[in-house]
């Protein structure tokens, strides 16, 4: 008998689990868009230097008479190499001679120019305000915009480590509620930040709590459902996050002011925090951490809400201890992250898996965090990317079961790299083609992530699987944090970050064949089993345990 048998007695998927799952999925739906908010709140609108004669309507009317805005622009702003008005330079004084195009005058490149000492004028046709227009994060300060995204992702990295440990020590429910409140306060406050430094600090704290919320949503769903319903619960959580992306695109289209959009996704978190008081703590965690009385109380509460009062009354401490004997013994075995590197074969697997996860997450977040670089209609891109992630689950299921782990990851990582490189060199004018290639890249990146998760779980021994998942998660989050930081390289070349994303994906595809295939192979239970394995030589045991991948 095991804990899953206790759950079967109190109801494997009853009203209690459905209500719990509903609240957690809503939390995923509202939380996930906070990762992508800066696609809109930090969008860069068209801009040019503020010029007295051009942008001061009263003075320009008095001084220039009937000159059109285009004529005023011509004498005030120089042209760049593409014959478009410069965004970061202006003429030191009006160049009246440029009005007469037939007249001979010195080379335009010899005319005196200066930086935008009086600030900028922004195009408000798409975004009425963003953090870029609020704090002039353009030209010499454009790298600061990438720093805001980097700090949020760095917060996710640090938060996943800190809150992951605290969740195991103090409980999933408590940390989940604390993180909901932290995200609500910090991102609501960010909408009113008086300076850019304060805004970045608040976004770092918001990222600190975001990953913990998403992780604990999945953990609480898994720990309160029996195995046959766990994949369904996790799938619903993933679909809720995808739906959150679609809703973000729609609301951002309707709300073009960054303060309002920030509040629309932050204020509902206060309601979720208040609602989460009815969320149940994981009974499994309570029992394993030597709090069996509280665990028994939660199980009886679940039985009562599921309409199984008799089953709840039959639960006693003796029954509980008997059912949880194996789990309690397993919990006494303490593992360390250093155990992952003590033996050569496991060390090799962890290092290779870490690079694959790093490259995969860098490319994935490089795509989803920088929609504006892919095309003009960022709202449609956001909705499309959320939509293509839904069928990606089915593609991953088919690939894992028919192509295997090695082939599927290698194929889709190569395809991801090629897609990103194609986006880089497709002209901006070919918007339909850019949109199609970008959507393909997002779908493929989602497939590779799911394949990587499955492969990683099957390559690590049972005694260290959770520890290995945590370490690989750190490698993943480092890649995610570096993705926005690489956009600083656009000052040297607009294509350079995208080339790095694409090349990293291809390198990841080259690394995957160095890992053993695990399809229909027994899961290793100990480090010794991992060390005895040889690539392509281990025979599957008919009676062995293996991981079955479903469409969920």
From Swiss-Prot:
Membrane-topology annotation of the record: Multi-pass membrane protein
CDD domains found in the cross-reference section: MFS_OAT
GO MF entries: organic anion transmembrane transporter activity; short-chain fatty acid transmembrane transporter activity; sodium-independent organic anion transmembrane transporter activity
GO biological processes: hormone transport; organic anion transport; short-chain fatty acid transmembrane transport; sodium-independent organic anion transport
Reaction catalyzed: butanoate(out) + estrone 3-sulfate(in) = butanoate(in) + estrone 3-sulfate(out); propanoate(in) + estrone 3-sulfate(out) = propanoate(out) + estrone 3-sulfate(in); pentanoate(in) + estrone 3-sulfate(out) = pentanoate(out) + estrone 3-sulfate(in); dehydroepiandrosterone 3-sulfate(in) + butanoate(out) = dehydroepiandrosterone 3-sulfate(out) + butanoate(in)
Transmembrane segments: 16-36, 144-164, 178-198, 204-224, 234-254, 260-280, 350-368, 378-398, 407-427, 436-456, 469-489, 495-515
Topological domain ranges for the Extracellular compartment: 37-143, 199-203, 255-259, 369-377, 428-435, 490-494
InterPro entries linked: MFS, MFS_dom, MFS_trans_sf
Localization annotation: Basolateral cell membrane
Positions in the Cytoplasmic compartment: 1-15, 165-177, 225-233, 281-349, 399-406, 457-468, 516-552
Glycosylation sites: 39, 56, 62, 102, 107
Keyword flag Transport: yes
Keyword Amino-acid biosynthesis appears in the UniProt entry: no
Gene3D superfamilies per UniProt: MFS general substrate transporter like domains
Cellular component annotations (GO), alphabetically ordered: basolateral plasma membrane
Region entry Disordered, spans: 525-552
Family affiliation: Belongs to the major facilitator (TC 2.A.1) superfamily. Organic cation transporter (TC 2.A.1.19) family.
Functional description taken from the UniProt entry: Sodium-independent organic anion transporter, exhibits high specificity for sulfated conjugates of xenobiotics and steroid hormones such as estrone 3-sulfate (E1S) and dehydroepiandrosterone sulfate (DHEAS). Can transport the statin pravastatin and may contribute to its disposition into the hepatocytes when the function of OATPs is compromised. It is specifically activated by 3 to 5 carbons-containing short-chain fatty acids/SCFAs, including propionate (propanoate), butyrate (butanoate) and valerate (pentanoate).
Protein name: Organic anion transporter 7
Organism of provenance: Bos taurus (Bovine)
């Amino acid at each position: 008998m095991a804990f899953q048998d206790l759950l079967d007695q109190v109801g494997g998927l009853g009203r209690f689990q459905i209500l719990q799952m509903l609240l957690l999925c809503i939390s995923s739906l509202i939380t996930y868009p906070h990762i992508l908010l800066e696609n809109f709140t930090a969008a860069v609108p068209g801009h040019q230097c503020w010029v007295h004669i051009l942008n001061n309507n009263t003075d320009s009317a008095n001084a220039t008479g009937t000159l059109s805005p285009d004529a005023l622009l011509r004498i005030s702003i120089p042209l760049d190499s593409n014959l478009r008005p410069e965004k970061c330079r202006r003429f030191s004084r009006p160049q009246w001679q440029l009005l007469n195009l037939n007249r001979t005058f010195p080379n335009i490149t010899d005319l005196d120019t200066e930086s935008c000492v009086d600030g900028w004028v922004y195009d408000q046709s798409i975004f009425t305000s963003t953090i870029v227009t609020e704090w002039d994060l353009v030209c010499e300060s454009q790298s600061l915009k990438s720093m805001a995204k980097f700090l949020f992702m760095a917060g996710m990295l640090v938060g996943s480590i800190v809150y992951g440990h605290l969740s195991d020590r103090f409980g999933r429910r408590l940390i989940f509620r604390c993180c909901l409140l932290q995200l609500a306060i910090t991102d609501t406050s960010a909408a009113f930040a008086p300076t850019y430094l304060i805004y970045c600090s608040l976004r770092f704290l918001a990222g600190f709590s975001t990953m913990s919320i998403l992780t604990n949503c999945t953990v609480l769903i898994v720990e309160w459902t029996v195995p046959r319903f766990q994949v369904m619960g996790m799938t619903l959580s993933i679909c809720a996050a995808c739906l959150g992306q679609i809703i973000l695109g729609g609301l951002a289209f309707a709300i073009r002011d960054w303060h309002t959009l920030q509040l629309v996704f932050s204020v509902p978190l206060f309601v979720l925090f208040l609602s989460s008081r009815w969320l149940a703590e994981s009974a499994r965690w309570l029992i394993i951490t030597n709090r069996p009385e509280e665990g028994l109380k939660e199980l009886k509460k679940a039985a009562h809400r599921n309409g199984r009062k008799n089953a709840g009354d039959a639960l006693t401490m003796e029954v509980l201890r008997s059912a949880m004997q194996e789990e309690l013994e397993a919990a006494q075995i303490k593992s360390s992250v250093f155990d992952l590197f003590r033996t050569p074969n496991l060390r090799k697997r962890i290092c290779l898996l870490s690079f694959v996860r790093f490259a995969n997450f860098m490319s994935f977040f490089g795509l989803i965090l920088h929609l504006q670089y892919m095309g003009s209609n960022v709202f449609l891109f956001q909705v499309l990317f959320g939509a293509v992630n839904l069928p990606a689950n089915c593609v991953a299921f088919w690939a894992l079961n028919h192509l295997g782990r090695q082939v599927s990851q290698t194929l889709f990582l190569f395809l991801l790299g090629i897609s990103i490189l194609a986006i880089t060199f497709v002209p901006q004018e070919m918007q339909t083609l850019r949109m199609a290639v970008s959507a393909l890249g997002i779908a493929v990146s989602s497939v590779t992530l799911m394949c990587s998760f499955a492969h990683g779980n099957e390559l690590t021994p049972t005694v260290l699987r959770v520890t290995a998942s945590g370490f690989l998660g750190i490698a993943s989050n480092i890649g995610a944090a570096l993705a926005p930081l690489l956009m600083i390289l656009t000052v040297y070349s607009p294509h350079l970050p995208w080339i790095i994303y694409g090349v990293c994906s291809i390198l990841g595809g080259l690394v995957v064949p160095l890992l053993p295939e695990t399809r229909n192979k027994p899961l290793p239970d100990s480090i010794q089993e991992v060390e005895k394995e040889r690539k392509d030589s281990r025979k599957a045991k008919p009676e062995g345990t293996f991981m079955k991948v479903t469409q969920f």
